[in-house]
Amino acid sequence: LTPRTEEKEGHHVRIKIINPNTTWSMTEKIGACARAVAHAGTEIVAVSPAMGPVSIESHYDEALAVPGLLQEIAAGERDGIDGYVIACFGDPGLKAARELARGPVVGIAEAAMHLASMVASRFSVVTTLGRTMGQAWHLAEIYGMERFCANVRACELPVLELEEPGSNARERIVDECRRALDEDGSDCIVLGCAGMTDLCEHIAGLLGVPVIDGVAAGTKLIESLVTLKLKTSKHGELARPLPKTMMGALEGFTLRG
């Protein structure tokens, strides 16, 4: 048998999973999910930024999550991280992160939708709040997944309710997934929030269809890209940003030549 690349070269894969919100209980859950699917030779580093919103439920929240996310990408580059997963279904800051990173970066919506299109003819996204449905549709369009996406559904469930003991969040999500299969003509479910990551196997067992969590999907995609030695292209749009002075509160984001 031929040794795996990381064994042959004495290097194990290091993947940084960035939860762009600052709720550590969710980050721990996300990290546990990634470790459960990662290869034994892969190190998972799960983090939350030092600054940002406690949850991401609007365009405003998403915009304010990006600076802390980019700080974590920059730190990962200093620490020798091989690849990154952005663990928020809005895929915030994805292209900016790719500009900073040498290795591959994927968002969980991007990863989940692409994998869903490979195992089903149509999928439904089940997310938290109705106000985020437009962003999910937008991502489906820009990723070329709109023709596979039968519907985007919301449980009207605040993100942090997923972290509350005794919450009926699980039952509400399962009910919405069941309605998606009955009403949308879909044959696969994409979970539209990183906070749902621990529900994937439970829902799949109940419904008997593929249920895709973007954290697991993103972790395995990054592992594959790193194994194939595919890095973010630095020719053209995703080249490192030009050196530029940042002012005021953004002074720490100044890039030197």
Question: Predicted regions: what is each one?
Answer:
Residues 25, 117-155, 168-171, 224-257:
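Short, glycine-/small-residue-rich phosphate/pyrophosphate-handling segment
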Residues 17-18, 78-88, 185-194:
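Periplasmic-binding protein-like
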Residues 15-37:
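N-terminal beta1-alpha1 ligand-phosphate binding loop
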Residues 1-12:
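Short, Lys/Arg-enriched N-terminal segments with co-localized hydrophobic residues
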Residues 63-80, 171-185:
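Short, well-structured alpha-helical segments in soluble
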Residues 46-73, 160-165:
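N-terminal beta-loop-helix "entrance" segment that forms/cooperates
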Residues 137-192, 199:
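Active-site rim beta-loop-alpha module in soluble metabolic enzymes
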Residues 98-119, 202-222:
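Short, acidic/small-residue loops that bind anionic groups at enzyme active sites
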